[in-house]
């Protein structure tokens, strides 16, 4: 797998951070993931959030019902941690193979996170149980105090929450999701084998200038927010190094167009249709295509203790234009890189 390959064959990838929503939105977006990825970690921030085994089983079935015939896709369900969650319910879901991991949202950090955790101490019995049974903790790593600048929230989270937590529960497996800063890249790289990270395509391809200079681009607005270019470069260097505890997590987060193009727009990039080709472009730009397959298809399963997929897909290097929009009942979705010409795409 060396540039300038015209066709890139890799083991089927997995998406270790995905939002599928529910209802008509779910039915619209599921096929864009299920046609490419073997598995995906599905976020639980519905309204109401997924906090019980029964809710997760029902949601998993709704996802499977939306998978087109011929797609071989397994949704991996997560539990939304709350201050009042029963550790026994979490353990039951994990033992029954319903919950793959549990998600920590600091209260009000992102979309539908108002039920999130108010403090680590409030959920310590749950976290201690997770450490005991080997259940991974997935973390949206931002503090949400009103007096902390939005561009500093990830770095402050590391020092005030993440490091004290990992010092207290040394055997807990933690995924630091959608990292966006040099601080986080360095922290994960310097950590032990129980700490990993996911990175989105938008945080590898863009920085805050792309979102804000020459006009506001709402379809690049996501949380954690895009940072300055020194942070983008640190993320690119981390994936290009072949570091084996960082892996693909798109954080694909669809919102209808009118909810993005608004005076108070929603955070999230719907990147499922274009993410894999976007990652390939970054790896090619960094002269690191030899590490692309591991990032997409190997590092994640290894950290989670799951087998790699036994099928393969191909990406083709030829210019294609991304659709301007995707139909959604009585609205539209605007995909990541809408209307732009991309270099790599999945071979159909």
Curated annotation (Swiss-Prot):
It comes from the Bacteria. Substrate binds at residues 19-21, 45, 140, 223, 255, 267. Zn(2+) 1 binds at residues 17, 19, 103, 251. It is an enzyme of class 3 (hydrolase). GO terms for molecular function: dihydroorotase activity; protein homodimerization activity; zinc ion binding. The lineage of its organism: Bacteria, Pseudomonadati, Pseudomonadota, Gammaproteobacteria, Enterobacterales. Pfam families: Amidohydro_1 (PF01979). SUPFAM superfamilies: Metallo-dependent hydrolases. Its cofactor is Zn(2+). Keywords: Hydrolase, Metal-binding, Pyrimidine biosynthesis, Zinc. Induction: Induced by pyrimidine limitation. Belongs to the metallo-dependent hydrolases superfamily. DHOase family. Class II DHOase subfamily. This is Dihydroorotase. GO terms for cellular component: cytoplasm; cytosol. InterPro entries: Amidohydro-rel (IPR006680), DHOdimr (IPR004721), Dihydroorotase_CS (IPR002195), Metal_Hydrolase (IPR032466). The active site is at residue 251. The keyword Metal-binding applies. Binds 2 Zn(2+) ions per subunit. In vitro, can also use Co(2+) or Cd(2+). The modification N6-carboxylysine is found at residue 103.
